[in-house]
Amino acid sequence: MFDFKVLSRSTNTAGRVGRLSTPHGILSTPQFMPVGTLGTVKGITATQLKDTNAQMILANTFHLHLQPGEAIIKESGGLHSFMSWDQPILTDSGGYQVFSLGKLNKIDDFGVSFKSPRDGSHIELTPEKAIQIQMDLGADVVMAFDQCPPYPASKVEVEEACKRTHLWLERCVATHSKEDQALFGIVQGGCFLDLREESARRVASFHLPGIAIGGVSVGEPSDQIHKIVRHVAPLLPNEVPRYLMGIGTIREMAVAVANGVDFFDCVLPTRLGRHGTALVRDERWNLRNACFRNDYQPLDTTCVCETCTNYNRAYLHHLIRNDELLGLTLLSLHNLSHLIRFSRAMAVAIEDDCFSEDFAPWQKSSIAHYTW
């Protein structure tokens, strides 16, 4: 039911093109996953999402547990039915969201207890409960419950989080029993490469169908992210997909793919869209700016998404300046299309064995002109 195959490899980098088969379809890699935290990619319908060529989306276990609750979703036929999305879904474990609550939570080896940010009620989340919730939600790929240390954190704090992550992974594996779901483990270790090495070794020892690199994009500078990815990705098994969590800029994506990462997710493209910002080439354009008031060109002349095909910059400027919901949707659609198109361009370059030449600039610094 789950199968991952590497179809092409880059000669001069670790980049690869793959195919992950799931019960709800194929994920072609490398691939960017849109984030649908509450079972929706904000402001976008499932049909519109498919038009961006999105293949798999991420939903958030923590938030869906709080509202509407996994029982409601299970009764509706599972998350695919609930949100009318018939393609692959990945659910994260909720660990990052819980730990981001800071003083609202208490952590020990048993699990995490915290006050609900919605109504103040007391909630306990353990590895067993996180997996049970995800089994009820019915996603194709589910993530182990982990402890994501903040940045910065001392080595002692990060080492403790790693040990707890590995302990919890054992309990996640023991609890997970759904054959039509793939459980992925998560490598932690902060910016300490020796801890990353040990975590990669421990997680790989469980022989899971996929492994994620977690604990990045939590406030550390981009050069630290690159160092972690370059060090950790080669340590992971070749035969399983590698998922870099929380990454959504073209530079980070290019570095990740060059080092053998297969897919990634981020809220950035839709968050920027909701704030009136478009991703165009390697730049971010604020459509509120007056320079777009009488600019009648397509948003991105190289893009064929719904937004760029049908609307000009002046109209988008008008929508954004007047806080029209359509403007936020159109920019979000374009931004998602932009990153998904970039993913596909990297795949084609790997297949043609020109990835190291075509995408080398993106791995070094931002540039203003490109050919994809």
From Swiss-Prot:
The active site is at D92 (proton acceptor), D265 (nucleophile). It catalyses: 7-aminomethyl-7-carbaguanine + guanosine(34) in tRNA = 7-aminomethyl-7-carbaguanosine(34) in tRNA + guanine. GO terms for molecular function: metal ion binding; tRNA-guanosine(34) queuine transglycosylase activity. Residues 246-252, 270-274 are annotated as: RNA binding. Pathway: tRNA modification; tRNA-queuosine biosynthesis. Keywords: Glycosyltransferase, Metal-binding, Queuosine biosynthesis, Transferase, tRNA processing, Zinc. It is an enzyme of class 2 (transferase). Belongs to the queuine tRNA-ribosyltransferase family. This is Queuine tRNA-ribosyltransferase. It comes from Prochlorococcus marinus (strain SARG / CCMP1375 / SS120).
